[in-house]
Regions:
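Conserved ABC ATPase signature
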Residues: 27, 52-56, 60
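Helical segment within the ABC ATPase nucleotide-binding domain
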Residues: 92-105
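ABC ATPase nucleotide-binding domains
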Residues: 152-174
Length: 174
């Protein structure tokens, strides 16, 4: 989990996302304010903008870091294991948020996930790697197979299809 800067509010941290557009002599602009408000709105943090980071839950803090990245207004959002250290509720909340950012704002999301079921459920395209080499790439349900899981992770697994859950994997043995 990210270290928490002391004495910093949610809004101030998110404003750091605007640093690429500022200089030493330039004060924050209306465009900066709008970008920060948009990022806070996208991450459901408008009501927490004045809160100290230390007063937030782990899931809320993770959303603040995402809001900071969103404030940059780039077309691509890169996330490295965004659900690590979060409990199940906040994992799902965060993944639903990321999916909404992709669906509603057409952001390209590049995300590292180690939970195969999360990758199946929340990814449009996956790349599986082993020792720095791409082993499989494509649509999750086409490339995440028991053979690929055995090759990449050394794990025997079965896959099930459920009407409510969709496709999911159950690891069996090593």
């Amino acid at each position: 989990q990210n270290d928490i800067p002391q004495d910093l509010t949610v809004e101030k941290l998110v404003m750091f996302g605007r640093m690429p557009y500022s200089s030493l002599l330039k004060k924050k602009t209306e465009e900066d304010e709008e970008a920060v408000t948009w990022a806070l709105s996208c991450t459901n943090l408008l009501d927490k903008r004045e809160n100290d980071l230390s007063a937030l839950s782990g899931g809320e803090r993770q959303r603040v870091w995402i809001a900071m990245a969103l404030a940059q207004k780039s077309e691509i959002l890169c996330l490295d294991e965004p659900t690590t250290y979060l409990d199940i509720y906040y994992q799902l909340e965060l993944l639903e948020l990321v999916k909404a950012l992709n669906d509603k704002h057409h952001l390209t999301i590049v995300m590292v996930l180690h939970d195969i079921n999360q990758a199946i459920r929340y990814s449009d395209h996956v790349i599986l790697m082993k020792n720095g080499q791409i082993v499989a790439e494509g649509l999750p349900r086409e490339v995440i197979t028991k053979e690929v899981i055995k090759d990449v992770y050394g794990v025997n697994a079965v896959f099930h299809e459920d009407e409510q859950l969709g496709l999911y994997m159950m690891p069996l043995s090593i």
